[in-house]
């Protein structure tokens, strides 16, 4: 038998409350991101479905590049839009202009308003925005789970190094199947 076979509704209530304070955060899966996202999009969509089923908040982070000299992630362009293959199941879409998602005042206000303190992270780029966001979340004392098979990078060779980095900063690195079986 499994642990869930022995849970009563009373026993499950604390789990439900914990999940209300948790969020799946999908970072920068936008048209201008590395095409490597196509290798993870199915798992990201599975993670989104799992989050909805488990009553987690589903949050999307978009990067807007305001630098004059660059052409990617420009506000109002197709490149800045979320990738069309991704399931968008909420209106909780926040924009950032720096690599750390916590620099978005609207995002941090939303987290505070809803008491969100635990995160499951998916998206890109593992060596940039995910790295900065995870570091800063862990530094603030949040619980951070990086879904290792739901992240990618422009340079996929850096993924093992990034996973070790996340762990060294106090983040849990897990595969999607490890959390969806709970």
Language-model segments: residues:
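Short, small-residue-biased leader/transition segments that mark boundaries at the very start
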Residues: 1-13
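Active-site-adjacent betaalpha module
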Residues: 16-23, 42, 46-54, 71-182
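Short, conserved beta-strand edge motifs with alternating hydrophobic and charged residues
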Residues: 25-27, 59-62, 94-95
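Active-site loop/turn elements of alpha/beta-hydrolase fold enzymes
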Residues: 29, 63-65, 149
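Short acidic, Gly/Ser-rich segments with clustered Asp/Glu that frequently serve as metal-coordination loops
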Residues: 30-36
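Conserved protein kinase catalytic core
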Residues: 34, 68, 155
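Flexible, glycine- and charge-enriched loops at secondary-structure boundaries
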Residues: 37, 41
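Von Willebrand factor
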Residues: 51-67
């Amino acid at each position: 038998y499994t642990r869930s076979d022995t849970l009563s509704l009373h026993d499950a209530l604390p789990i439900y409350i914990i999940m209300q304070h948790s969020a799946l955060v999908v970072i920068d899966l936008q048209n201008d991101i590395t095409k490597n996202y196509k290798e993870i999009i199915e798992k990201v969509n599975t993670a989104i479905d799992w989050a909805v089923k488990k009553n987690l908040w589903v949050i999307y982070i978009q990067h807007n590049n305001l630098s004059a000299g660059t052409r990617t992630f420009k506000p109002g362009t197709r490149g800045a839009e979320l990738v069309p293959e991704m399931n968008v199941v909420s209106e909780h879409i926040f924009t950032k202009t720096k690599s750390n998602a916590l620099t978005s005042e609207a995002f941090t206000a939303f987290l505070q308003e809803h008491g969100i303190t635990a995160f499951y992270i998916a998206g890109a780029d593992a060596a940039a925005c995910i790295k900065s966001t995870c570091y800063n979340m862990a530094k603030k004392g949040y619980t951070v789970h990086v879904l290792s098979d739901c992240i990618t990078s422009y340079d996929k060779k850096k993924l093992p190094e990034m996973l070790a980095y996340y762990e060294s900063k106090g983040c849990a690195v897990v595969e999607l199947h490890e959390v969806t079986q709970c």
